[in-house]
Curated annotation (Swiss-Prot):
Organism whose genome encodes this protein: Bacteroides thetaiotaomicron (strain ATCC 29148 / DSM 2079 / JCM 5827 / CCUG 10774 / NCTC 10582 / VPI-5482 / E50)
Name this protein carries in UniProt: tRNA-specific 2-thiouridylase MnmA 1
Catalytic activity: S-sulfanyl-L-cysteinyl-[protein] + uridine(34) in tRNA + AH2 + ATP = 2-thiouridine(34) in tRNA + L-cysteinyl-[protein] + A + AMP + diphosphate + H(+)
Renumbered residue ranges of the record's region Interaction with tRNA: 142-144
Lineage start: Bacteria, Pseudomonadati, Bacteroidota, Bacteroidia, Bacteroidales
EC number per UniProt: 2.8.1.13
Positions annotated to bind ATP: L6, L7, S8, G9, G10, V11, D12, S13, G120
The entry's keywords: ATP-binding, Cytoplasm, Disulfide bond, Nucleotide-binding, RNA-binding, Transferase, tRNA processing, tRNA-binding
Cellular localization per UniProt: Cytoplasm
Length: 355
């Protein structure tokens, strides 16, 4: 079996290589380079990642190729993120990176020559009724199916997730026993292409700054100023620079550059129990096409270990609405609502939250 393995320089993808070699495979290793654009944003993390990936390749006597998808990334994923932010929405570039770059452009240029592509994502694949489904990982804290929820059937059918059945601690123990150079390396955080670059610096580069008012939702009183609505997301608590907190961002007026906040975590205006999903995407197929209008599901509206129980309502015209079993804080339009089966074992698909 001919396998392409994607390396990031981290412990997870390194253990993937170790496990594949243990099973008798000799995968071809690839590092996808996307990175920030511009000398003022130069960051050493990509160089460190490539050095670590090279060390793994050398340890197992495998070839490593650096695939430069910088142009494709910026024309697709970064442009998508900036467009959503400018509209006052909350994008998820990591979701689009997986769909369009790692399993899109890479597949078209390189992956098509291999039987499977193996990655260090915490996810699984499940064969059911003759079809491949995206399954959740053993480790609920590290599960990354919400970041994979926009891939299609052809993509999920070619993917291997060798560490999906392991807990994170088990992965680190394997790396330590195998003497992998990445065994003690910290997990990466934040958006995939930013490295150590500050998110606000990235946004400021493209959208600049424009002072606007921060207004208390209940009273209409101005309580502060901000540097641009695009620096803030629905549900945000930190970084507002207001005294007498806690304060939460409740909504944004994009036209007037106003941010509305509410005082105190338990304020009813912060919460909602339903939202709509635009352009819902089924990864494999719609498993409920013959069911009634309301289906019992679990779902996520942000990257957390917890699944929320609810109902998926299929409306006329192919639209979908989610009814949550509990109040939700910070429903952010632009983010992805990710839908799972009732047991939270299969990730069925996702769509953009429109509220």
């Amino acid at each position: 079996m001919n396998i392409a393995a994607l390396l990031s320089g981290g412990v997870d993808s390194s253990v993937v290589v170790h496990l594949l070699c243990e099973q008798g495979y000799k995968p071809t290793l690839f590092y996808i380079k996307i990175g920030m654009d511009g000398a003022e944003y130069m960051d050493c993390s990509a160089e460190e990642d490539i050095e670590m990936s090279t060390a793994i390749a050398r340890k197992y006597g495998l070839s490593l190729e650096v695939v430069d998808l910088h142009k494709e990334y910026w024309e697709n994923v970064a442009a998508y993120a900036i467009d959503k932010i400018k509209k006052g929405l909350t994008p998820n570039p990591d979701v689009m990176c997986n769909k369009l770059i790692k399993f899109g452009c890479f597949e078209q240029q390189v992956g098509k020559n291999f039987d499977f592509t193996a990655t260090g994502h915490y996810a699984t694949t499940i064969r059911q009724d003759g079809k491949t489904w995206l399954g959740t990982a053993k480790d609920p804290v590290k599960d990354q199916t919400d970041f994979l929820a926009q891939i299609d059937y052809l993509q999920v059918s070619k993917l291997m997730f060798p560490i999906g059945g392991l807990m994170k601690q088990e992965v680190r123990e394997i790396a330590s026993r195998a003497g992998l150079p990445s065994a003690r390396r910290k997990d990466s955080q934040g958006i995939c292409f930013l490295g150590k670059i500050n998110y606000n610096d990235f946004v400021r580069r493209f959208l600049g700054e424009r002072e606007g008012a921060i207004i208390e939702l209940e009273t209409g009183k101005k309580v502060g100023t901000h540097r641009g609505y695009w620096f803030h997301t629905i549900g945000q608590r930190k970084g507002l620079g207001l005294s007498g907190g806690p304060w939460f961002v409740i909504k944004k007026d994009v036209e007037e550059n106003i941010i509305y906040v509410s005082h105190g975590y338990g304020v009813e205006t912060q919460f909602g129990s339903e939202f709509r999903i635009n352009d819902f995407h089924f990864i494999t197929e719609n498993p409920w096409k013959d069911a009634g209008k309301e289906i019992d599901i679990t779902f996520k509206i942000r990257h957390t270990p917890e699944f929320t129980k609810g109902k998926l309502v299929q409306e006329e015209g192919g639209q979908f609405r989610i009814l949550s079993s509990e109040k939700l804080q910070g429903i952010a339009p632009g983010q992805f609502g990710v839908i799972y089966d009732e047991e939270a074992g299969i990730c069925v698909g996702s769509g953009e939250i429109t509220r």
